[in-house]
């Protein structure tokens, strides 16, 4: 499965045409997502960034013709949380057509509402079992 080396950012030239940009600071969640999504569709490259500021920097350096097909954000990340990232992304119209998903352990209605208002297309609760995680991964891939 094509995935980014853990916590390393490939050059833009090395990114395949179709990729998902993940904001995820938990290495275990990253490894699990790599395995599950790779088993579903190994043609999609997964680029993981471990904090909100670095994710925005990576996104802003991408050319218009090489944007991710999906952005998935953990709500609780260092430097900028998922809602703060969404608000920044919303300011730039070039990201308007990219589906954006918040991926969180919190089932707080306030967090969900804040994220949807900030520009998330979906707010998914991180499942506690593998079957539900596979279903969530399939759903994310359907958005890409």
Positions of PLM-derived features:
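Conserved acidic segment of CheY-like receiver
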Residues: 17-38, 71
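Conserved Asp/Asn-Gly motif in the active-site loop of CheY-like receiver
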Residues: 46-56
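C-terminal output helix
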Residues: 54, 128-138
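Active-site residues of response regulator receiver
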Residues: 69, 73-75
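Receiver (REC) domain active-site loop signature in two-component systems and cognate sites
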Residues: 77-79
């Amino acid at each position: 499965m094509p995935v980014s080396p853990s916590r390393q950012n490939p050059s833009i030239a090395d990114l395949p045409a179709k990729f998902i940009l993940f904001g995820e600071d938990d290495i275990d969640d990253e490894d699990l997502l790599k395995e599950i999504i790779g088993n579903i569709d190994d043609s999609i490259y997964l680029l993981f960034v471990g904090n909100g500021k670095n994710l925005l920097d990576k996104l802003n350096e991408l050319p218009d013709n090489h944007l991710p097909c999906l952005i998935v954000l953990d709500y609780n990340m260092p430097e900028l949380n998922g809602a703060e990232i969404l608000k920044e992304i919303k300011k730039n119209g070039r990201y308007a057509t990219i589906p954006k998903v918040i991926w969180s352990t919190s089932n707080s209605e306030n967090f969900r509402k804040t994220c949807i208002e900030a520009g998330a297309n979906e707010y998914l609760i991180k499942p506690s079992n593998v079957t539900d995680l596979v279903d969530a991964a399939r759903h994310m891939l359907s958005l890409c």
